[in-house]
Amino acid sequence: MNAAYLQLFEQIWNDASKLQEVTDEVIENITTVYNENSPDYLYFVTLYNIFNEFLEDVSEDVLPNEATGFKESKIWGMLYNFQKDAALAIINKLEKYNGCILADSVGLGKTFTALSVIKYYENRNKSVLVLCPKKLANNWNTYKYNYINNPIAADRMRYDVLFHTDLSRESGNSNGMDLDMVNWGNYDLVVIDESHNFRNGGKISGENEKENRYLKLLNKVIRKGVKTKVLMLSATPVNNRFVDLKNQIALAYEGESQLLDEKLNTHKSIDDIFKQAQTAFNTWRKWEPEARTTS
């Protein structure tokens, strides 16, 4: 048997048609291994090898369309690089998942980042509503009016600004708009400033079974009329329960958890995932401080 294998080896070894010159390839591979590559190069190679399986999920359908000219806008030019990265990521998530939470800390410019996203959708001829607490009215009005203190007046922003409390009103005027005439269901994008105010979810209470603001938002703005994307801004999206976050995320899929389950293609429902996370957190919180690690 050994003699037969040896004869076969000799036959192949002496057959020039079966030989392949690999010297140059071996030298190239060895050289690559021993090259002194920059830290940046090694960093990006590492990122690629970790995340390359997710690249197939990225398509031109969900990437920002630069042909809209939003990168030539005044607001875009005023952003820091980290805000530009955030804006592009937000647009991607709005297109792919229909919703996004921008949860940067106070002072990191969430308003300006959101304005750049609004500009992107306005350039696509989309109708945008900003819902904010009444105390923040001037914060948003400044950037849409032709005021001398408006640094982005050249962008001619045209979004509407209404208040959280307006969701429960049926008449009267608010921020220069007649609430009798507002077409709540005609907004392609709603930006909710301080979205943590909607963390308690939908409830019907009282003898007359009145909807709370959360349900008003779902039924008047998100579920009704055109398909509405939801951008939420909050430095504190979670108070002390994970359900706070779940209720806000639910706004992006019209309160129907199965819609998000289908989009994420998870093995468990989003409701079960949050319940499991809350249980794990409650257990962790009871441990002694020295035992509370993230490992």
Where are these regions (language model features)?
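Short hydrophobic/aromatic beta-strand immediately N-terminal to the Walker A/P-loop
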Residues: 99-102, 129, 231-232
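Residues that form or flank phosphate/diphosphate-binding pockets in enzymes
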Residues: 97, 109, 139, 240
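ATP-dependent helicase/translocase motor core
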Residues: 1-105, 112-124, 199-209
